[in-house]
From Swiss-Prot:
The protein, known as: Putative odorant receptor 85d
Keywords: Cell membrane, Membrane, Olfaction, Receptor, Sensory transduction, Transducer, Transmembrane, Transmembrane helix
Species of provenance: Drosophila melanogaster
Quaternary structure, from the entry: Interacts with Orco. Complexes exist early in the endomembrane system in olfactory sensory neurons (OSNs), coupling these complexes to the conserved ciliary trafficking pathway.
Pfam families reported for this sequence: 7tm_6
C-alpha cells in the first residue's frame, strides 16, 4: 500500500511541475539528433558531442545524396530508353520526397543562428513557475501539439519502414517459411549503379544504404515540420493569453496613467509576437513552398500509380504514401489556420473589454490596435502563398491537373 501511495504522490508531483519550453521542441530535436544535427544552439552542449554529431551528419548526407543521384540516373535512363515508364514515375515520387527532405535539412542548418534567436525570445516569454503558467493553459496546448506530432511521425515511420523492409520480409518469408531459394533480389527503391548490386554482399550494402538514406530523409522532413508547428503552437498560445488578458482588463477605474501603462505593455507584447511570426516565416517560408509544391506532385504521381493497376502489396504502400502526403498538408494548414484565428482574436478582445469608462485618449488608442489586428499573422510560403485550410483545396486542384496530364500522356 505504501508503494502505491508513493507512486501516486510521485505522479501528482510530476503533474504539478512547470512545463519547460523544451517539452514542445523535444520531438523535433530527437529526429534532428538522429541525423547528427542540431537545429539551434543548446545551452549545455559539449564540444565532443558536437564533433561527433558533425561527422555523423556528414556521413548521413553523403549517403543520402549518393542514393538520390543513383535514383535520378535510373529515371533519366528509363526515360531516355523509353522503358520502365511505370517504375520511373514511381521513382519520381520518391525523388521528390528526398529532394524536399534534403532541401529542408540544408535550409534549417543555414538558418541555425536565426532559429536560435527565435527560441531564445520564446524562452524569455515562456512563463517559468507553475502559478505563472496556469493562465496560459500550457498543458492543453502541449497535449494538443503532442497528439498531432505523434500521429504525424507515427504514420510516416510506418510508411518509410513499410517501404524499407518490404523486400527483407519477402526474402525471409520465401527463404525460411516457403523454402523458395530462387527469387529475384530487389531493393526498396529503383536505382542505377555501375556494378551488379544483386550478387554477393553488394546487395546487403545497397539495401542498408537505402534504408539509412530513407530514414535520414524522413527525419529531416519530420523534424522541420514538427519544429515549425511547435513554434507556431507557442505563438498561438501567447496570442490566446494576450486576448484573455485584454478582455479581463477594466479601464477607467484607475488613473489614465495606469491604463496607459497597460496599453503600452499590451502593444509591446503584441509586437513581439508579430515579429516572431515574421521570423518564423523567413526561416520556414521557402521550406513551406517546397512542401506544398512537392506534395502536389507526390499526390499526382501516387494517384497515377494507383489508377493504372498494381499488385495488392504495391497498392497498399501507395495508399499509405498518399495518406501521409495528405496528413502533412493538413497538419501544416491546421496550425496555420489556428495562427490566423488566434491573431485575429486580438482585435475582438480589444473591442470586448470594458473600455466604456476609460479616458477619451485611451479609447482613441484602441482603434490603432484593432486596425493592426485586422491584418492577422499568417504562415507564408514566401510571397507566393498564404497558408490556411483554404490552401488544401487549391493544392488538390493543382494535383488533379497534373494527374490528368500524366494520365493523358500514358494513354497516348
Amino acid at each position: 500500500m505504501l508503494t502505491k501511495k508513493d507512486t501516486q504522490s510521485a505522479k501528482e508531483q510530476e503533474k504539478l511541475k512547470a512545463i519547460p519550453l523544451h517539452s514542445f521542441l523535444k520531438y523535433a530535436n530527437v529526429f534532428y539528433l538522429s541525423i547528427g544535427m542540431m537545429a539551434y544552439d543548446h545551452k549545455y552542449s559539449q564540444k565532443w558531442k558536437e564533433v561527433l554529431l558533425h561527422w555523423t551528419f556528414i556521413a548521413q548526407m553523403v549517403n543520402l545524396n549518393t542514393v538520390l543521384i543513383s535514383e535520378l540516373i535510373y529515371v533519366f535512363l528509363a526515360i531516355g530508353k523509353g522503358s520502365n515508364f511505370l517504375e520511373a514515375t514511381m521513382n519520381l515520387s520518391f525523388i521528390g520526397f528526398v529532394i524536399v527532405g534534403d532541401f529542408k535539412i540544408w535550409n534549417i542548418s543555414r538558418q541555425r543562428k536565426r532559429l536560435t534567436q527565435v527560441v531564445s525570445r520564446l524562452e524569455e516569454l515562456h512563463p517559468q513557475g507553475l502559478a505563472q503558467q496556469e493562465p496560459y493553459n500550457i498543458g492543453h496546448h502541449l497535449s494538443g501539439y503532442s497528439r498531432y506530432s505523434k500521429f504525424y511521425f507515427g504514420m510516416h515511420m510506418v510508411l518509410i519502414w513499410t517501404y524499407n523492409l518490404y523486400w527483407a520480409v519477402y526474402y525471409l518469408v520465401c527463404d525460411f517459411w516457403l523454402g523458395m531459394r530462387q527469387f529475384e533480389r530487389m531493393l526498396p527503391y529503383y536505382c542505377w549503379v555501375p556494378w551488379d548490386w544483386s550478387t554477393g554482399y553488394s546487395y546487403y550494402f545497397m539495401y542498408i544504404s537505402q534504408n539509412i538514406g530513407g530514414q535520414a530523409c524522413l527525419s529531416g522532413q519530420l523534424a522541420a515540420d514538427m519544429l515549425m508547428c511547435a513554434l507556431v503552437t507557442l505563438v498561438v498560445m501567447h496570442f490566446i493569453r494576450l486576448s484573455a488578458h485584454i478582455e479581463s482588463h477594466v479601464a477607467g477605474i484607475g488613473s489614465f496613467q495606469h491604463d496607459l501603462e497597460f496599453l503600452q505593455a499590451t502593444v509591446a507584447y503584441h509586437q513581439s509576437l508579430i515579429h516572431l511570426c515574421q521570423d518564423i516565416n523567413e526561416i520556414f517560408g521557402v521550406s513551406l513552398l517546397s512542401n506544398f509544391v512537392s506534395s502536389s506532385f507526390i499526390i499526382c504521381f501516387v494517384g497515377f500509380q494507383m489508377t493504372i493497376g498494381s499488385k495488392i502489396d504495391n497498392l497498399v504502400m501507395l495508399v499509405l504514401f498518399l495518406f501521409c502526403a495528405m496528413v502533412q498538408v493538413f497538419m501544416i494548414a491546421t496550425h496555420a489556420q489556428r495562427l490566423v484565428d488566434a491573431s485575429e482574436q486580438i482585435g475582438q478582445a480589444v473591442y470586448n473589454h470594458d473600455w466604456f469608462r476609460a479616458d477619451l485618449r485611451y479609447r482613441k488608442m484602441l482603434i490603432l490596435i484593432i486596425k493592426r489586428a485586422q491584418q492577422p499573422s499568417r504562415l507564408k510560403a514566401t510571397m507566393f502563398l498564404n497558408i490556411s485550410l483554404v490552401t488544401v483545396s487549391d493544392l488538390l486542384q493543382l494535383s488533379y491537373k497534373f494527374f490528368a496530364l500524366l494520365r493523358t500522356m500514358y494513354v497516348n
